[in-house]
Amino acid sequence: MKNINPTQTSAWQALQKHFDEMKDVSLADLFAKDGDRFSKFSATFDDQMLVDFSKNRITEETLAKLQDLAKETDLAGAIKSMFSGEKINRTEDRAVLHVALRNRSNTPIMVDGKDVMPEVNAVLEKMKTFSEEIISGSWKGYTGKAITDVVNIGIGGSDLGPFMVTEALRPYKNHLNMHFVSNVDGTHIAEVLKKVNPETTLFLVASKTFTTQETMTNAHSARDWFLATAGDNKHVAKHFAALSTNGKAVGEFGIDTANMFEFWDWVGGRYSLWSAIGLSIILSVGYDNFVELLSGAHAMDKHFANTAPEKNLPVLLALIGIWYNNFFGAETEAILPYDQYMHRFAAYFQQGNMESNGKYVDRNGNAVDYQTGPIIWGEPGTNGQHAFYQLIHQGTKMVPCDFIAPATTHNALSDHHQKLLSNFFAQTEALAFGKARDVVEQEYRDLGKDPATLENVVPFKVFEGNRPTNSILLREITPFSLGALIALYEHKIFTQGAILNIFTFDQWGVELGKQLANRILPELGDDKDINSHDSSTNGLINRYKSWRA
């Protein structure tokens, strides 16, 4: 990958000039001038997904200039580098190949001269065999009973992805009850353990190194809880499996290494749900549905790798995001799924985006003088409408939004889905076009209100509009369409990182807090006051010691 400061390109300078021409242009005017705007600024993927980006503050000229930026920063070369197994994660000297995990074409993908696909397929086959034993009930616990509950113990990428997907695909789930434990706060695992029976519970310990503090603390507590009933250490092997690469530590824990599912250093944590980390997904919805998830992602991978940038959905969404973040000064993006099963989707891509592109140093090691990753947040509709949409509609901050909805629901109760979708359509229309003062005044006159009332109330009922949105309409949330949607966002994030000249696939920002926590932990073992930190940290620790039970 080339190291090009995007702000030093001629395309960036052209975009800055273009922004000065565009900053006061309204969406209402853009739509009024072009009756064909929707067809020009929308695209359908695989007859499964409609992406409408027409309600953005862009013109064809805007997109052309953004595409020039992609060309000048060699996005095409960056895409080829990732798919060909080059070590584009340079700070960790690793390839970035989550695309290999869902390579359903099974074409060779090389890392260090070796095709990784045979190993990928072998782990998938092992997961298939194991999951079929658990789901069928042929796998028995230490008292001869079949497994009824699965507890996934992990954190970050070992938790957020599997949890999001198992929730999103709940309509496809089998009889197994899924539980997820991530937080080192003992409350998290304590509450889960209240719901399960040691005789019929399987624990998945998801840690590549088998040393992650939060995960191993929870795993040891789960094992202690299990042994309090089971008694004999030999029973651990029937109730614990590992998603890891550290066979020695896994064996010492009591897990049979035959039930250790490996993945590789070219799989980043936040891109790992496609790997052995996705075992909880397979146990929840079955192997065939997991393969459909992989197939949907692979279809989007092929679209991303092979489609011209002018028609390339991840590229288009990425460029529009850069336009708002760096030229309009928008600091956040909201992801708003109108599907309750998708309630963890925004949280998943909060990590996916912010841990990937939350960097202030470029690929040359220099501090950047432009914006990199945005703040990502969101909640399902319509809940969000009654919480934070007020600020999006009438606040002082621009919040570009992605609205996501399925045309067909899994729960066709009465007219619920029509009401949900009427809100989905209405919100993007309201955000784009608003409500002008003269319209509000006329509404009040039609109600027979006197002029004094008009003056007191009308200013507060005006909606400026011109708030940008993307709408992503799926036929239905299926394993295939969900896989494609996740991959769409993954490649959007990669595209932005490539253009913005940052390393998307490391996460050094999580390390300093860990180091300091490891230094502080021994200081909490007694009741002595400490003075080894700044006055604030000393004061907090000493008050904690005096207050704790």
Curated annotation (Swiss-Prot):
Disulfide bridge map: none
Q: Which GO terms describe its cellular component?
A: cytosol
Q: Which InterPro entries match?
A: G6P_Isomerase (IPR001672), G6P_Isomerase_C (IPR023096), Phosphoglucose_isomerase_CS (IPR018189), SIS_dom_sf (IPR046348), SIS_PGI_1 (IPR035476), SIS_PGI_2 (IPR035482)
What residues form the catalytic site here?
A: E355 (proton donor), H386, K514
Q: Name one GO molecular function term.
A: monosaccharide binding
User: Could you say which EC number(s) this protein's record lists?
Assistant: 5.3.1.9
- Give one Pfam family: PGI
Q: Where in the cell is it found?
A: Cytoplasm
Pathway, per record: Carbohydrate biosynthesis; gluconeogenesis; Carbohydrate degradation; glycolysis; D-glyceraldehyde 3-phosphate and glycerone phosphate from D-glucose: step 2/4
> Which keywords accompany this UniProt record?
Cytoplasm, Gluconeogenesis, Glycolysis, Isomerase
Report which reactions are catalysed by this protein: alpha-D-glucose 6-phosphate = beta-D-fructose 6-phosphate
Tell me a GO biological process for this protein: gluconeogenesis
Its top-level enzyme class, in one word, is: isomerase
Could you confirm whether the keyword Isomerase appears in this record?
yes
PROSITE patterns the UniProt entry points to: P_GLUCOSE_ISOMERASE_1, P_GLUCOSE_ISOMERASE_2, P_GLUCOSE_ISOMERASE_3
- Chief site of localization: cytoplasm
Known role: Catalyzes the reversible isomerization of glucose-6-phosphate to fructose-6-phosphate.
Q: What protein family does this chain belong to?
A: Belongs to the GPI family.
Q: Can you say what this protein is called?
A: Glucose-6-phosphate isomerase
**What organism does the record attribute this protein to?**
Enterobacter sp. (strain 638)
